[in-house]
């Protein structure tokens, strides 16, 4: 996994601790990491920064969730591999899965970008992103609507779209 080694080096040098103390700093830290990581991809492979920010807000409660604090996991990334370092949900200590532990929060963003770019579950996301890139019209709500598979919650995309709207109002 050369991309991971490269990304880890980049992430470790890019605000590895993300020492945010408020929502504005959280947004700026996630933005800085995402912009830097996106620079390693061609334009049509980049994940929109505001989508990453909105999803990290939603998944990590503004970086304050247990999984974000203890596992540097800003995006609720699960693992089913018992060999991976992971945190189990407190209400499901015997779950067959856990939330993956990352060295840095930026590494979790890198993993998320790779997931969207290469995992077959996100083909619809990539197709929609390419159509939007080709037409020069970015519609984050439409992109978010392709991410239903990301979570078990049947209302996930609606919640993500609401977070995008709140983020836009927040700015």
Feature map (PLM): residue ranges:
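Catalytic cores of secreted/periplasmic lytic hydrolases that degrade extracellular macromolecules
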Residues: 2-53, 58-171
């Amino acid at each position: 996994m050369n991309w991971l080694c490269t990304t880890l080096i980049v992430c470790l040098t890019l605000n590895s601790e993300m020492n945010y103390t408020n929502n504005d700093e959280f947004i700026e830290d996630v933005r800085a990491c995402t912009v830097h990581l996106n620079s390693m991809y061609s334009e049509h492979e980049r994940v929109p920064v505001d989508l990453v920010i909105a999803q990290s807000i939603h998944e990590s409660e503004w970086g304050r969730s247990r999984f974000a604090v203890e596992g540097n996991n800003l995006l609720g990334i699960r693992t089913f591999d018992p060999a991976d370092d992971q945190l189990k949900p407190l209400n499901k200590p015997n779950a067959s899965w856990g939330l993956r532990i990352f060295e840095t929060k930026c590494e979790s963003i890198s993993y998320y970008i790779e997931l969207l770019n290469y995992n077959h579950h996100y083909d619809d996301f990539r197709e929609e992103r390419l159509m939007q890139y080709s037409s020069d019209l970015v519609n984050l709500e439409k992109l978010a609507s392709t991410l239903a598979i990301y979570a078990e919650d049947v209302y996930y995309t609606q919640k993500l779209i609401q977070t995008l709207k709140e983020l836009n109002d927040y700015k």
